[in-house]
């Protein structure tokens, strides 16, 4: 374990003493440091009628227990304080450590003893994470140190778990959206699942916009998947034009219906544990699946601003600008009289994507988004540089396949009976509009590109993204983060994992940092919390997070690729082609082992190479035919210890998100030896070699200069490392599987790898 503490708010002595007193710690500025520490420790054992017993189970020195120490005349020293602090946080002498000083250095322990600062040290200790993954104060509250009185209690600028999660209100409302996506002449109704604590105070809201939450149709999804085995189409030379079109909602009328009291209820919905954490701290949770999902009406428009509007309508309702009904019969309306109108959206992948789309509307009431692994351009999710390009792990998927997965209205037999014929008509229109044949950008994709509206974002923004996420690739966050207005507060966490959440990591206090931010933005707490704009997980060692100023630098280093002419054959034998198509993982293994069709260049680094941004391959290339696709991957190659990309559980259910509520495991990325690590990758239809809007011909056996931008990253390579460049055609995980008989030739003498370099 290593501390990377970003959530602690430096506090004055007077304020620290005041907050400790509010928690019931009987500390006195006039007492000695030793007396105050003893008083603090005894308070920790509030379950015991006699605190001597648990105190005797701690050691103050290697040869003296804590009870004996406090009964002695010995003075408090750094060694005693450190040893006791470690034990209070759950570290066991002789098990977790033998030499406290060395262990503290390894931990990067954030508290440095000064006898005159004991009150501040105790305050800091309470806000520091235990071995279990919870801060000490959260651990104490989870054990019942504070009663669940359904009111706010704060410590170090963060809300504590004092809301009763055993008496939650669970209710359903149906919000009227200014849409008619299925064109039935009726405004669409949006189902909203609300979970909120009982409270006399207006509550802020965490909203998870999740098209998955009302169920998914995996059978329809699998039937809709596309075969990837097809020839690469030769496209006609042309220029693509699109236009920015403002989304215009339909008109709605003020509701004059009576207020209803009898709301639909529910017992369970699959929740997001970060939401649960805040539910226990006085934040209502709502789950909204949007148009075309079970319980709602309309068509699943998948990614456009009509879908975004269905979520926006819910924020409007929370602020009194839209109507909600108690049921589909629309006999009574219901108002959000429990809400303070301020909303933060949460969720990963499609959920985080909807957060980004919502933010670009500039809707009033949306104070903040926490968007994890979020899409900012749907074209860049299902296409790349004029190619159909499947997200990592999902060959054959496209946006209409996702529509089939998430159109959960068809899971309700009655809805299927009444609406499936119309749904199939609209789905067919969507399938035609996305133009899988060419892979080109068009108006359909432009209408699903949130980047063009990034300037309208006015809420605070928090993004998290994995630099090993080949599902929602790093370009998605790179482009939106760098397009955000300079006038807003923005934060980016870049971790070394894949398509995963990061709130329950051991090495970073993400959960607590979000607590401090949300208390500022949604509760109006003046806590003076300041979070760095960008935090990056170091790839060279375990559990090390660093501040960064930018994602993408203008300083470049050009690396020569050699002097040879390299031939890349596209064609595989029938058996090999079928085997790779059946299991793309076998293809990846062969590719990285140098066995698949490829041109391979190894570069032994003579100095450190701190990459920050978008690597570009500038290549001199020719094709034997009038078509060609180019794929590239950059590897950190050779055996050494590296971070894994999938977090593993360190402890099971050690994190309590409230008071015995919604427990979850503590996780971390492992650090272990392997043979290589993918740094970046990229794909291009050579007919789109100059830009996305220009379709050009490929002259047979004529040299072309191609600039292939790879996925942006931040990655540190060290002197002596090997940077491996792999150039090839068909990628069996991502691209169409064209087995036609053509070849590409690369002139390495006129080719370079252009690397953006982080400044010192």
Curated annotation (Swiss-Prot):
Catalytic activity as recorded in UniProt: Hydrolyzes Xaa-Pro-|- bonds to release unblocked, N-terminal dipeptides from substrates including Ala-Pro-|-p-nitroanilide and (sequentially) Tyr-Pro-|-Phe-Pro-|-Gly-Pro-|-Ile
Classification via InterPro entries: AB_hydrolase_fold (IPR029058), Galactose-bd-like_sf (IPR008979), Pept_S15_Xpro (IPR008252), PepX_N_dom (IPR015251), PepX_N_dom_sf (IPR036313), Xaa-Pro-like_dom (IPR000383), Xaa-Pro_dipept_C (IPR013736), Xaa-Pro_dipeptidyl-ppase/CocE (IPR050585)
Location of the active site: 349 (charge relay system), 469 (charge relay system), 499 (charge relay system)
Keywords: Aminopeptidase, Cytoplasm, Hydrolase, Protease, Serine protease
Main location: cytoplasm
Class in the EC hierarchy, top level: hydrolase
Compartments, as annotated in UniProt: Cytoplasm
Xref: Pfam families: Peptidase_S15, PepX_C, PepX_N
Membrane-spanning intervals of the chain: none
One BP annotation, GO: proteolysis
Classification via SMART domains: PepX_C, PepX_N
EC number(s) per entry: 3.4.14.11
GO CC annotations, alphabetized: cytoplasm
GO molecular function: aminopeptidase activity; dipeptidyl-peptidase activity; serine-type peptidase activity
Function: Removes N-terminal dipeptides sequentially from polypeptides having unsubstituted N-termini provided that the penultimate residue is proline.
Family affiliation: Belongs to the peptidase S15 family.
HAMAP family: Aminopeptidase_S15
Self-association and partners: Homodimer.
Name of this chain's protein: Xaa-Pro dipeptidyl-peptidase
Upper lineage: Bacteria, Bacillati, Bacillota, Bacilli, Lactobacillales
